């Protein structure tokens, strides 16, 4: 509802300049925008329960079809970015805790500072300038794969589809196009998780139980994996779930910079053009992902911390 109180009429962006008032009104009736907003809301929600998210005002295509087309592109990017972010934050968090006050600690905290301070779209532009413009190590930031490579789509995840079909050239091209946007999302997302891992690890290392286990001469590897690692990761699942959800919504500008043509870029275009069905679908799908993500986070939390029972 909130998007509809903003200035601007989506109908005016699709009718020709020569359209009369009658033409505009007929188009408005065609998309159901002439009815009271509460009736529009209940009609839309009844359609959602049937799997119908409406028709895009701008493209006149079913929104569900566009979601199927665009969502896998964003999920592939966000999933790889999240995995890289999670691994980076765990590695730097424990490294910083073990080397507290030393050069490694300062370097890890500098990475956190950079990740917290830089806007993701600006960081993406810097990476493009360095790795594509100056070093020529990365492909042009246009799309997900080279235009002259053919690939049959099964899942919408280009890397997975390339593996299924055994198209190694397509796999290499897809990975090279993923490198910079994944690096962008990974570093930005790793900052808060790394800080959480570091703080938890320092707390565990300072606990009497850890000192007692260390004093009993337990092997350093066993001490790390059975005591420090698991206990330090207890607070991480909820924060990681929040970061994953933020990456889905926050990938909009990164997709725009890299011409990714994903779910986020599709939603941004819908927002700029006041395409109500597109915006509403983006909000609902994103909210649904948050519910699923936090459900998974709660399950992982219960596995890491036996004190939690549901």
Language-model features and meaning:
Residues 1-42, 131-170:
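Hydrophobic alpha-helical transmembrane segments of membrane transport/permease proteins
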Residues 12, 34-90:
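An internal, D/E-rich "acidic patch" concept
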Residues 13, 36, 105, 121, ...:
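Alpha-helical transmembrane segments and their helix-entry boundary regions
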Residues 23, 27, 37-53, 63, ...:
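Hydrophobic alpha-helical segments of integral membrane proteins
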Residues 91-127:
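Cytoplasmic-entry segments and transmembrane alpha-helices of multi-pass inner-membrane transporters
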Residues 115-137, 239-244:
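Hydrophobic alpha-helical membrane-insertion segments
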């Amino acid at each position: 509802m909130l998007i509809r109180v903003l200035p601007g009429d989506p109908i005016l962006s699709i009718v020709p300049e020569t359209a009369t008032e009658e033409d505009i009104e007929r188009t408005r009736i065609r998309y159901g925008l002439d009815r009271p907003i509460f009736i529009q809301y209940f009609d839309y929600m009844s359609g959602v329960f049937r799997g119908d998210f409406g028709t895009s005002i701008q493209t006149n295509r079913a929104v569900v079809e566009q979601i199927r087309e665009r969502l896998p592109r964003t999920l592939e990017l966000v999933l790889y970015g999240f995995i890289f972010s999670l691994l980076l934050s765990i590695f730097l968090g424990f490294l910083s805790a073990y080397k507290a006050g030393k050069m490694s600690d300062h370097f890890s905290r500098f990475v956190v500072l950079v990740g917290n301070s830089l806007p993701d779209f600006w960081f993406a532009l810097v990476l493009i300038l360095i790795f594509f413009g100056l070093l020529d190590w990365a492909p042009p930031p246009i799309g997900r794969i080279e235009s002259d490579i053919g690939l049959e789509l099964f899942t919408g995840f280009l890397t997975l589809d390339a593996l299924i079909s055994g198209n190694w050239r397509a796999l290499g091209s897809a990975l090279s196009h993923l490198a910079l946007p994944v690096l962008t999302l990974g570093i930005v997302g790793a900052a808060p998780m790394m800080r959480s891992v570091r703080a938890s690890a320092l707390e565990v290392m300072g606990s009497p139980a850890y000192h007692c286990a260390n004093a009993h001469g337990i092997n350093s590897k066993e001490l790390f994996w059975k005591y420090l690692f698991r206990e330090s990761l207890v607070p991480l699942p909820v924060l990681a779930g929040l970061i994953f959800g933020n990456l889905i919504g926050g990938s909009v500008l990164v997709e725009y910079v890299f011409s990714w043509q994903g779910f986020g870029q599709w939603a941004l275009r819908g927002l700029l053009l006041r395409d109500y069905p597109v915006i509403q679908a983006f909000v609902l799908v994103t909210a649904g992902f948050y519910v699923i993500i936090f459900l998974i986070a709660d399950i992982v939390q219960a596995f890491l911390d036996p004190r939690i029972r549901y």
